[in-house]
């Protein structure tokens, strides 16, 4: 698979500029994915710059391995979530870094070619694990949570206003048969909401899928942890760039950057994609980049 053909890294130029890349620097890409940002950093810090790339999705690692092979020992790959930055850097023998980037969005590989239930456009098992070594799946949540727990999850993690009728419909439907695939879940959600309340700009199941993915992968907890811990490893004057894709994440980044005494906020408002990038890559429309500097 040619990773470069199926994925376009968002806000690439803006991120590279904010990182203030230096030849020979050591940088962390906390979400390697298909290697777009990783390779850009390596290209711009040649010949001696290094990247420690964190990635917990084995499929993404396999898809990007050939593309990144030419960088040889300049690239250190860590199969961990970015929340484990301390363990990963210690294993790599690195104590301090010159910059850190995380891009929290799903890759095209996961949305378009995956088989783990991230997309409601495909009929896959309700899995949603980024790291298939994990035990909890979306199907497990759907099958075991109470109606109240499901409603709270959809409201808190998906900001879904129809959380309660959706939760009630799921509990009723699972009494008849297990809900184990994406299409099953989509049908239940669509029927639970009167058509006049179906959102016009997004799919009716978008927020439910978002909530389940966040819960399965403890995404918000991981995001909070990396912001809390990053100051220990970033050198003074180095930059921390975070690209998020929905308001839940962005609010956490905004608040924690401002509250953390290790950081000075560089972007008071999130940086968004320009018209040219929007025309080239429609998935960039939701991208929000915030940057802080280690003091």
UniProtKB/Swiss-Prot annotation:
Q: What are its GO cellular component terms?
A: cytoplasm
Q: Which NCBIfam families match?
A: 16S rRNA (cytosine(1402)-N(4))-methyltransferase RsmH
Q: What class of enzyme is it?
A: transferase
Superkingdom in the source lineage: Bacteria
Q: Which family does it belong to?
A: Belongs to the methyltransferase superfamily. RsmH family.
Molecular function per GO:
rRNA (cytosine-N4-)-methyltransferase activity
Task: List its EC numbers.
Answer: 2.1.1.199
Q: What does this protein do?
A: Specifically methylates the N4 position of cytidine in position 1402 (C1402) of 16S rRNA.
Please report any disulfide bonds recorded for this protein chain, giving both cysteine positions: none
Q: Does the keyword Cytoplasm apply?
A: yes
**Where does the record place it?**
Cytoplasm
Q: Name one GO biological process term.
A: rRNA base methylation
Q: What is this protein called?
A: Ribosomal RNA small subunit methyltransferase H
Reactions catalysed, as given in the entry:
cytidine(1402) in 16S rRNA + S-adenosyl-L-methionine = N(4)-methylcytidine(1402) in 16S rRNA + S-adenosyl-L-homocysteine + H(+)
Keywords (alphabetical) are: Cytoplasm, Methyltransferase, rRNA processing, S-adenosyl-L-methionine, Transferase
Main location per the UniProt record: cytoplasm
Quick one: which residues bind S-adenosyl-L-methionine? Answer: 35-37, 55, 82, 103, 110
């Amino acid at each position: 698979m040619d990773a470069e053909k199926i994925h376009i890294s968002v806000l690439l130029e803006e991120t590279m500029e904010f990182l203030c890349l230096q030849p020979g620097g050591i940088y962390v890409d906390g979400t390697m994915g298909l290697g777009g940002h990783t390779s850009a950093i390596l290209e711009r810090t040649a010949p001696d710059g290094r990247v420690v790339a964190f990635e917990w999705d084995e499929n993404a690692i396999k898809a990007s391995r050939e593309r990144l092979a030419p960088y040889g020992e300049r690239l250190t790959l860590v199969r961990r979530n970015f929340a484990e930055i301390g363990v990963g850097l210690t294993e790599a023998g690195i104590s301090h870094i010159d910059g850190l980037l995380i891009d929290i969005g799903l890759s095209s590989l996961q949305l378009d070619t995956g088989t783990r239930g991230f997309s409601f456009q495909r009929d896959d098992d309700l899995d949603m694990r980024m790291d298939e070594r994990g035990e909890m799946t979306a199907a497990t949540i759907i099958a075991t949570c109470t109606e109240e727990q499901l409603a709270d999850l959809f409201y808190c993690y998906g900001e879904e206003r129809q959380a309660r009728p959706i939760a009630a419909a799921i509990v009723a439907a699972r009494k008849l048969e297990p809900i184990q695939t994406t299409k099953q879940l989509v049908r239940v959600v669509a029927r639970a909401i009167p058509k006049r309340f179906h959102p016009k700009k997004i799919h009716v199941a978008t927020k439910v899928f978002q909530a389940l993915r966040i819960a399965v992968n403890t995404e918000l907890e991981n995001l909070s942890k990396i912001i809390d811990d990053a100051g220990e490893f970033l050198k003074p004057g180095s930059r921390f760039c975070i690209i998020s894709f929905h308001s839940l994440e962005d609010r956490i980044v905004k608040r924690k950057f401002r509250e953390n005494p290790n950081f000075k906020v560089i972007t008071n408002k999130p940086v968004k994609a320009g018209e040219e990038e929007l025309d080239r890559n429609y998935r960039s429309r939701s991208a929000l980049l915030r940057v802080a500097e280690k003091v």
